Amino acid sequence: MDPTIAAGALIGGGLIMAGGAIGAGIGDGIAGNALISGVARQPEAQGRLFTPFFITVGLVEAAYFINLAFMALFVFATPVK
Protein backbone atom coordinates (compact mmCIF):
# COMPACT_ATOMS: atom_id res chain seq x y z
CA MET A 1 0.00 0.00 0.00
CA ASP A 2 1.24 3.46 -0.85
CA PRO A 3 2.17 5.32 2.37
CA THR A 4 0.51 8.47 1.06
CA ILE A 5 -2.82 6.68 0.65
CA ALA A 6 -2.53 5.13 4.11
CA ALA A 7 -1.69 8.50 5.67
CA GLY A 8 -4.59 10.17 3.88
CA ALA A 9 -6.98 7.46 5.03
CA LEU A 10 -5.85 7.80 8.64
CA ILE A 11 -6.03 11.60 8.57
CA GLY A 12 -9.46 11.47 6.95
CA GLY A 13 -10.67 8.96 9.51
CA GLY A 14 -9.36 11.11 12.34
CA LEU A 15 -11.09 14.19 10.95
CA ILE A 16 -14.34 12.27 10.61
CA MET A 17 -14.16 11.07 14.22
CA ALA A 18 -13.17 14.50 15.53
CA GLY A 19 -15.99 16.23 13.68
CA GLY A 20 -18.49 13.64 14.82
CA ALA A 21 -17.38 13.87 18.44
CA ILE A 22 -17.52 17.66 18.42
CA GLY A 23 -20.95 17.64 16.78
CA ALA A 24 -22.31 15.03 19.19
CA GLY A 25 -20.95 16.94 22.17
CA ILE A 26 -22.51 20.19 21.01
CA GLY A 27 -25.82 18.48 20.20
CA ASP A 28 -25.98 16.72 23.57
CA GLY A 29 -25.07 19.96 25.34
CA ILE A 30 -27.81 21.92 23.59
CA ALA A 31 -30.38 19.22 24.36
CA GLY A 32 -29.26 19.07 27.99
CA ASN A 33 -29.44 22.86 28.25
CA ALA A 34 -32.99 22.83 26.91
CA LEU A 35 -33.98 20.11 29.39
CA ILE A 36 -32.51 21.94 32.37
CA SER A 37 -34.09 25.23 31.29
CA GLY A 38 -37.48 23.59 30.84
CA VAL A 39 -37.36 21.83 34.21
CA ALA A 40 -36.21 25.04 35.92
CA ARG A 41 -39.19 26.92 34.47
CA GLN A 42 -41.76 24.17 35.07
CA PRO A 43 -40.64 21.46 37.50
CA GLU A 44 -43.96 19.63 37.12
CA ALA A 45 -43.23 19.08 33.40
CA GLN A 46 -40.11 17.05 34.14
CA GLY A 47 -41.68 13.73 33.14
CA ARG A 48 -42.90 15.11 29.81
CA LEU A 49 -39.50 16.63 29.00
CA PHE A 50 -37.37 13.54 29.57
CA THR A 51 -38.77 11.52 26.65
CA PRO A 52 -37.99 14.08 23.91
CA PHE A 53 -34.60 14.67 25.55
CA PHE A 54 -33.60 11.01 25.40
CA ILE A 55 -34.91 10.68 21.82
CA THR A 56 -32.83 13.71 20.79
CA VAL A 57 -29.72 12.40 22.51
CA GLY A 58 -30.25 8.99 20.91
CA LEU A 59 -30.51 10.50 17.44
CA VAL A 60 -27.40 12.62 17.99
CA GLU A 61 -25.45 9.59 19.15
CA ALA A 62 -26.77 7.56 16.19
CA ALA A 63 -25.31 10.18 13.87
CA TYR A 64 -21.99 9.76 15.67
CA PHE A 65 -22.06 6.00 15.10
CA ILE A 66 -22.79 6.61 11.41
CA ASN A 67 -19.60 8.72 11.39
CA LEU A 68 -17.81 5.81 13.03
CA ALA A 69 -18.97 3.51 10.22
CA PHE A 70 -17.71 5.94 7.56
CA MET A 71 -14.39 6.21 9.38
CA ALA A 72 -14.05 2.44 9.34
CA LEU A 73 -14.88 2.44 5.64
CA PHE A 74 -12.21 5.03 4.84
CA VAL A 75 -9.51 3.53 7.03
CA PHE A 76 -10.00 -0.20 6.54
CA ALA A 77 -11.20 -0.25 2.92
CA THR A 78 -8.15 1.47 1.44
CA PRO A 79 -6.80 -0.22 -1.68
CA VAL A 80 -4.13 -2.81 -0.98
CA LYS A 81 -1.54 -3.72 -3.60
From Swiss-Prot:
Predominant place of localization: membrane
The protein's name: ATP synthase subunit c
Matching InterPro entries: ATP_synth_csu_bac/chlpt (IPR005953), ATP_synth_F0_csu (IPR000454), ATP_synth_F0_csu_DDCD_BS (IPR020537), ATP_synth_F0_csu_sf (IPR038662), ATPase_proteolipid_c-like_dom (IPR002379), F/V-ATP_Csub_sf (IPR035921)
Function statement: F(1)F(0) ATP synthase produces ATP from ADP in the presence of a proton or sodium gradient. F-type ATPases consist of two structural domains, F(1) containing the extramembraneous catalytic core and F(0) containing the membrane proton channel, linked together by a central stalk and a peripheral stalk. During catalysis, ATP synthesis in the catalytic domain of F(1) is coupled via a rotary mechanism of the central stalk subunits to proton translocation. Key component of the F(0) channel; it plays a direct role in translocation across the membrane. A homomeric c-ring of between 10-14 subunits forms the central stalk rotor element with the F(1) delta and epsilon subunits.
Molecular function terms, GO-annotated: lipid binding; proton-transporting ATP synthase activity, rotational mechanism
Complex formation: F-type ATPases have 2 components, F(1) - the catalytic core - and F(0) - the membrane proton channel. F(1) has five subunits: alpha(3), beta(3), gamma(1), delta(1), epsilon(1). F(0) has three main subunits: a(1), b(2) and c(10-14). The alpha and beta chains form an alternating ring which encloses part of the gamma chain. F(1) is attached to F(0) by a central stalk formed by the gamma and epsilon chains, while a peripheral stalk is formed by the delta and b chains.
Family: Belongs to the ATPase C chain family.
Site (Reversibly protonated during proton transport): E61
Species this protein is from: Mycobacterium marinum (strain ATCC BAA-535 / M)
Coiled coil: none
One cellular component (GO) term of this entry: plasma membrane
Membrane topology, record value: Multi-pass membrane protein
Membrane-crossing segments per the record: 5-25, 57-77
One Pfam entry name: ATP-synt_C
Cellular compartments annotated: Cell membrane
Swiss-Prot/TrEMBL keywords: ATP synthesis, Cell membrane, CF(0), Hydrogen ion transport, Ion transport, Lipid-binding, Membrane, Transmembrane, Transmembrane helix, Transport
